[in-house]
């Protein structure tokens, strides 16, 4: 199979699911603000080397033009935490910084298409009777006879995972392409949505759509008044594994994303952050008492009992 049993149970454990009004991202924003840490926005770590005064030297760069920063600043730390998959971080590791480079694991390449249109979903496309109302959320599944092990064709003839009607909106007057009420849609798919698909799904005259839908970003039409595509490596394929990444890649170098190949959720990654924070404190206490120890099986990993399926 392409997913292990425990992750399957996690996917089915939706009872009591909640969200924050305005977006779950606010949880992590407030976590960061409550920490009183120095937060460097629009700044990325470009490389990690062995330090001279401390264990690690981090080189960073600004992601926006900034004349005031003509050089790449370097800061040294005794402990560092990499809280992103290394394979997507664009961070270069110096020689002998870690004992073993984490394995690259395959991620789902998810195409998210957000757009506005006065049109509604076509009942005909879904085999409904003329005039039948289409639900606000459409989820697809594969036919029983389809080979679901083929990662290149995991949605079958439907061509998408889901379509959601997010809200209804009325844009400010003065924009000819956005006159009247608009429906805001979101499509999840394994490949870019094509003009032919959009035409069939929403009963839009094909000749009114450009061959490349990305042209709608700059040139919206009366049928598609706003268009925003985004590609995410959204979550990993949770294949059954017998080994997993270490939490501590080297002495004082912690890696929360080792959890990704086991279970990939916000909650479990937050729990991993809690575990890493505890390990950092434990290591400092041991160092103060005259010991030096990297992560071993004897170190207590907290929170395991809190993982409920």
What feature does the model see in each segment?
Residues 1-57:
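Active-site/ligand-binding neighborhood in enzyme catalytic cores
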Residues 14-19, 100-106, 259-262:
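Active-site rim elements
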Residues 23-34, 114, 272-279:
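Amphipathic alpha-helical segments that form well-ordered structural scaffolds
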Residues 35, 77-78, 250:
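Short, well-ordered alpha-helix to beta-strand connector turns
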Residues 39-41, 82, 255:
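A structural signal for the hydrophobic beta-strands that form the central parallel beta-sheet
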Residues 42-44, 61, 256:
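Conserved beta-strand termini and adjacent loop/short-helix elements that scaffold enzyme active sites
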Residues 46-199:
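Mid-domain catalytic core of redox enzymes
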Residues 153-309:
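Conserved flavin/dinucleotide-binding core of flavoenzymes
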């Amino acid at each position: 199979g392409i997913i292990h049993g425990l992750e399957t149970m996690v996917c089915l454990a939706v009872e009591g699911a909640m969200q924050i009004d305005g977006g779950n991202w606010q949880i992590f924003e407030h976590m960061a603000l409550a920490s009183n840490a120095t937060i460097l926005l629009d700044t990325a770590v470009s490389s990690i080397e062995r330090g001279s005064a401390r264990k690690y030297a981090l080189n960073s760069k600004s992601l926006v033009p900034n004349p005031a920063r003509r050089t790449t600043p370097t800061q040294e730390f005794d402990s560092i935490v990499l809280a992103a998959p290394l394979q997507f971080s664009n961070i270069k590791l110096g020689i002998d910084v870690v004992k073993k480079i984490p394995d690259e694991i395959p991620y789902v390449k998810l195409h998210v298409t957000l757009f506005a249109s006065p049109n509604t979903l076509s009942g005909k496309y879904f085999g409904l009777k003329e005039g039948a109302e289409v639900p606000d959320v459409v989820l697809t599944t594969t036919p029983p006879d389809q080979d679901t092990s083929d990662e290149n064709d995991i949605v079958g003839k439907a061509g998408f995972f889901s379509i959601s009607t997010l809200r209804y909106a009325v844009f400010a007057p003065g924009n000819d392409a956005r006159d009247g009420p608009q429906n805001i849609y979101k499509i999840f798919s394994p490949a870019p949505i094509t003009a032919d698909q959009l035409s069939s799904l929403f009963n839009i005259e094909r000749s009114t759509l450009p061959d490349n839908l990305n042209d709608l970003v700059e040139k919206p039409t009366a049928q598609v008044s706003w268009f925003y595509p985004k590609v995410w490596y959204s979550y990993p394929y949770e294949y059954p594994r017998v080994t997993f990444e270490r939490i501590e890649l080297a002495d004082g170098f912690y890696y929360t994303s080792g959890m990704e190949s086991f279970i990939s959720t916000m909650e479990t990654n937050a729990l991993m952050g809690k575990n890493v924070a505890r390990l950092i404190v434990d290591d400092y206490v041991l160092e103060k008492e005259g010991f030096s120890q990297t992560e071993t099986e004897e170190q207590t990993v907290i929170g395991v009992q809190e993982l409920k399926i």
